């Protein structure tokens, strides 16, 4: 710690910080542009000037840039010195000489750091009367709009995109006061993390194009704290709503998880919530048509059929909340509850959970991944299946440069010096996959092989680290040399990290990862292990348990069960579509509860219209076992009273109560959570994931809307001039209103939107943190349910045989895509322009045998259908395999590992 003196007052601060960060952490306001907590200091904008004095007697002082000045013990500075204030005002005036002053038509207005800092410096009169330089804007793709004339040349965008996210297609061009930030030519930004430019940019140069089409000012949107639903990582988000539509998603700061950044799937993939074809009312089949029901009719009709059924089974979902899955389990009974996951995937999920629970290896939180000094990724294409982990791995690799700089006593915020000292030095990263990955550019070595051979590599590494681990026969000398290099790097690391997951389609890969971690722990290393699952609540569903989807279909096929309730699950993604349709056709009652129109609704007798994550509350558990709560953003029935969309758990519990002729006893979310904990002690911690519905601050609920929210009385004037009462939220501590507490200093961690007096942009998160860039002042939300035990598992001993290609037979290798493999985001219209066209990848040797070239269309039979796809050639894919884009429409993830026998050139 260090003692600094600011305008005559004494403060204790972290001596490792610079003065800007130290003062902001104290709650003092210093304007700045180029500095960002995640990017460090470069001193490019000169906006954060303060007066520094030699000692208490010095009255003259000198101007220094606070972001470039260490907060050393005994520092004397003044923020309010007149010369410093005039200098800061002049800097804004210089920046404004070329700015178009177009706030009324700028989409950043009301959410703009430049506006905030201009007001903070007191600059209110423009003296510049000459020609401004102008730029041509670029088309940067479907996600981001570009308006270069608003640029103040703070350099944040290229520092984030190139130095932090390792993007290669955004740069700065030009010189002196005429510089241009963009691509060499028009085109879609290639980085999976490009959307963060929207929040990194302090002006309106980069804005959210998906928001542009249905634009609202920040102060006119309703927000709620939420969790990204698009993968298993559980990033924290702030969705914004207006007129019953999601308008945008912003990053919600969580110092333990995603801190300042999201991936583009999480930021832009929300369009499925706004689809017009969603089920909005319960419907029941009458012949070939559906008739619309009200809630009471739906409950009574379903209850009558369920009472007559001899056995009702429930099929849950890894994209539904803990509460909804539990409500289904209560309705049908624990013995009749099935997870809705394919048997193989469920076995891998249970294995991953066993490793996390019993392996004795620590599982780091997302942000902690950045602190590891050697990383081995086994079998997982992390950028496509858990993209935010890939961004954290990139920071871990860069830790080498920080380590080298620290050895020379260079502060962690001196980023230019760190980059200069590091000269692209990296901590070792080793990646195995069936083909190229997006992490290959920073990897020390990549291994492209079938999953069996990837697992064998992992087992061999574990054996080389600890000879009591099972040995692997038949390793050739070249590969053994590489293994020796990997072993040397992992053994020499203080904090090695092993990453694997369920998406490779191989239990052996997970076992190999566990063996490597155990071997490293045995050598005394502070080792971590990270498992990536498939869906937002895969881990939660795995902890709940239940039979597999294959078991459920077996119940229907044999006639053992004559009614099935399917919860938020497109079963065609988890099993053969032919088998699913045949099994459902045998059931006298098929009830579907979902917020999306899925293929299985064609087989449904009754459809209950569920609420999406934006219209409901619930708890999900991420890949590290962290339980996190998401909250309802808006009530769709407020805008259209014909809409009947309830939380899945509310539908299912009402149905359960109707069947048993009793009163509904879960009238709010807290009742469901209490019931979950009573029945399943492994979920005891979810009660602490967020405060309950009685939580108040000075007697007030928490506001979902900024206090400047406007137009509420006119919002439904086209329907009726009589304004209805605002929706009442009995489930949570939030109010559907601007009336309520939204103070930055209030004791709360669930924060719907970032705002503080004088801070309207995302930089307002500074005001909610214990120190800038650290944890939230009152603790990061969420609670871990899985902690490493003292003991550990024995080594897994079954080493798979090496993959052998077979003539006339090809095995399907899984390829995942950030844009397209996820069930929900692929429905977003804006995503469909970024999704690749379905393809089949072939090794050049296999292509030659078949007599086909890139672009040739080939056919194969699967599940009773003939599939025809264009060929892509890949040297990385091993012969005897074909690659298919998992999860894309018509290509279910359950296909991974299946074999094809009739691959042939398609008939023209």
Swiss-Prot record:
UniProt binding sites for [4Fe-4S] cluster 3: 228, 231, 235, 263
UniProt catalytic activity: a quinone + NADH + 5 H(+)(in) = a quinol + NAD(+) + 4 H(+)(out)
GO cellular component annotations of the record: membrane; oxidoreductase complex
Binding site for [2Fe-2S] cluster: 34, 45, 48, 67
Record: residues binding [4Fe-4S] cluster 1: 99, 103, 106, 112
Needed co-factor(s): [2Fe-2S] cluster; [4Fe-4S] cluster
Domain 2Fe-2S ferredoxin-type: 2-83
Domain 4Fe-4S Mo/W bis-MGD-type: 221-277
Uppermost EC category: translocase
Subunit comment: Composed of 13 different subunits. Subunits NuoCD, E, F, and G constitute the peripheral sector of the complex.
Function, as annotated: NDH-1 shuttles electrons from NADH, via FMN and iron-sulfur (Fe-S) centers, to quinones in the respiratory chain. The immediate electron acceptor for the enzyme in this species is believed to be ubiquinone. Couples the redox reaction to proton translocation (for every two electrons transferred, four hydrogen ions are translocated across the cytoplasmic membrane), and thus conserves the redox energy in a proton gradient.
Name listed for the protein in its UniProt record: NADH-quinone oxidoreductase subunit G
Protein source organism: Salmonella typhimurium (strain LT2 / SGSC1412 / ATCC 700720)
Phylogenetic classification of the source organism: Bacteria, Pseudomonadati, Pseudomonadota, Gammaproteobacteria, Enterobacterales
Gene behind the chain: nuoG
């Amino acid at each position: 710690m260090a003692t600094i003196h600011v305008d005559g007052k004494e403060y204790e601060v972290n001596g490792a910080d610079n003065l800007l960060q130290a003062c902001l952490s104290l709650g003092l306001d210093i304007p700045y542009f180029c500095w960002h907590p995640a990017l460090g200091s470069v001193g490019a904008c000169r906006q954060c000037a303060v007066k520094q004095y030699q000692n208490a007697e010095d009255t003259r002082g000198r101007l220094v840039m606070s972001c470039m000045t260490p907060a050393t013990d005994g520092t004397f500075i003044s923020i309010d010195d007149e010369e410093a204030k005039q200098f800061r005002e002049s800097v804004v005036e210089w920046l404004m000489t070329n700015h178009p002053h177009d706030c009324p038509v700028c989409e950043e207005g009301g959410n703009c750091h430049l506006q905030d800092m201009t007001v903070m410096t007191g600059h209110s009169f423009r003296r510049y009367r000459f020609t401004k330089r102008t730029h041509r804007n670029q088309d940067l793709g479907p996600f981001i709009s570009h308006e270069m004339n608003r640029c103040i040349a703070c350099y944040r965008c290229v520092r984030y995109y190139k130095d932090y996210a390792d993007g290669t297609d955004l740069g700065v061009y030009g010189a002196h006061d005429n510089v241009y930030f963009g691509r060499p030519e028009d085109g879609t930004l290639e980085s999976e993390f490009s959307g963060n430019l929207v929040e990194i940019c302090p002006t309106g140069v980069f804005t959210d194009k998906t928001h542009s089409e249905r634009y609202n000012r920040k102060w006119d949107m309703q927000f709620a704290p939420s969790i990204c639903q698009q993968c298993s990582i559980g990033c924290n988000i702030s969705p914004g709503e207006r007129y019953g539509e999601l308008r945008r998603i912003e990053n919600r700061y969580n110092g333990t998880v995603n801190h300042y950044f999201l991936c583009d799937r999480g930021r832009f993939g929300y369009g499925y919530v706004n689809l017009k074809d969603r089920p909005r009312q319960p419907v029941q089949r009458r012949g070939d048509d559906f008739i619309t029901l009200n809630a009471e009719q739906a409950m009574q009709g379903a209850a009558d059929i369920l009472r007559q059924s001899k056995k009702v089974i429930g099929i849950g979902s890894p994209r539904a909340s803990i509460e909804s899955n539990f409500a289904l389990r209560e309705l049908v009974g624990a013995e009749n509850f099935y997870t809705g996951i394919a048997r193989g995937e469920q076995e891998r999920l249970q294995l991953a959970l066993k490793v996390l629970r019993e392996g004795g290896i620590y599982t780091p939180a997302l942000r902690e991944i950045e602190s590891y000094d050697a990383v081995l990724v086994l079998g997982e294409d992390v950028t496509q299946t858990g993209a935010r982990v890939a961004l954290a791995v990139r920071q871990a690799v860069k830790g080498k440069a920080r380590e080298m700089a620290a050895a020379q006593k260079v502060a962690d915020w001196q980023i230019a010096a760190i980059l200069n000292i590091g000269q692209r030095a990296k901590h070792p990263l080793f990646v195995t996959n069936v083909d190229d990955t997006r992490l290959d550019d920073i990897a020390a070595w990549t291994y492209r092989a079938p999953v069996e051979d990837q697992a064998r590599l992992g087992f061999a590494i574990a054996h080389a680290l600890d000879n009591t681990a099972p040995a692997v026969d038949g390793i050739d000398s070249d590969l053994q040399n590489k293994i020796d290099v990997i072993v040397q790097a992992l053994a020499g690391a203080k904090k090695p990290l092993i990453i694997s997951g369920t998406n490779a389609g191989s239990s052996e890969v997970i076992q190999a990862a566990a063996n490597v971690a155990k071997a490293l722990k045995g050598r005394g290393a502070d080792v971590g292990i990270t498992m990536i699952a498939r869906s937002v609540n895969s881990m939660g569903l795995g902890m709940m348990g239940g039979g597999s989807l294959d078991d459920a279909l077996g119940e229907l096929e044999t006639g053992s069960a004559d009614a099935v309730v399917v919860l938020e699950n497109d079963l065609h993604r988890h099993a053969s579509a032919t088998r699913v349709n045949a099994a459902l056709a045998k059931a006298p009652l098929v009830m579907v509860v979902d917020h999306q129109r899925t293929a299985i609704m064609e087989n449904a007798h009754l459809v209950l219209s569920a609420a999406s994550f934006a219209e409901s509350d619930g708890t999900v558990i991420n890949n590290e076992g962290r339980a996190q709560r998401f909250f309802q953003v808006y009530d769709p029935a407020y805008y259209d009273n014909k809409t009947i969309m309830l939380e899945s758990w509310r539908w299912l519990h009402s149905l359960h109560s109707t069947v048993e002729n009793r009163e509904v006893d879960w009238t709010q979310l807290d009742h469901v959570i209490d019931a979950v904990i009573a029945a399943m002690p492994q979920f005891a911690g979810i009660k602490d994931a967020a405060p309950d519905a009685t939580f108040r601050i000075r007697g007030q609920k928490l506001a979902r809307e900024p206090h400047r929210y406007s137009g509420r009385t006119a919002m439904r004037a086209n329907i009726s001039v009589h304004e209805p009462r605002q929706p009442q939220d009995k489930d949570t501590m939030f109010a559907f209103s601007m009336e309520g507490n939204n103070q930055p200093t209030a004791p709360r961690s669930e924060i719907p939107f970032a705002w503080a007096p004088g801070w309207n942009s995302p930089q307002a998160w500074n005001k909610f943190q214990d120190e800038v860039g650290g944890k939230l002042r009152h603790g990061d939300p969420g609670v871990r349910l899985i902690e490493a035990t003292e003991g550990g598992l024995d080594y897994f001993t079954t080493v798979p045989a090496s993959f052998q290609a077979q003539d006339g037979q090809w095995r399907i290798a899984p390829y995942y895509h950030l844009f397209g493999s996820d069930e929900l985001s692929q429905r977003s219209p804006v995503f469909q322009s970024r999704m690749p066209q379905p393809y089949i990848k072939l090794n050049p040797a296999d292509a030659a045998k078949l007599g086909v070239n890139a672009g040739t269309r080939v056919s194969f039979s699967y599940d009773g259908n003939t599939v025809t796809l264009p060929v892509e050639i890949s040297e990385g894919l091993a012969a005897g395999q074909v690659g298919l884009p998992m999860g894309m429409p018509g290509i279910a993830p359950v296909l991974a590992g299946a074999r094809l026998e009739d691959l042939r050139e398609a008939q023209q």
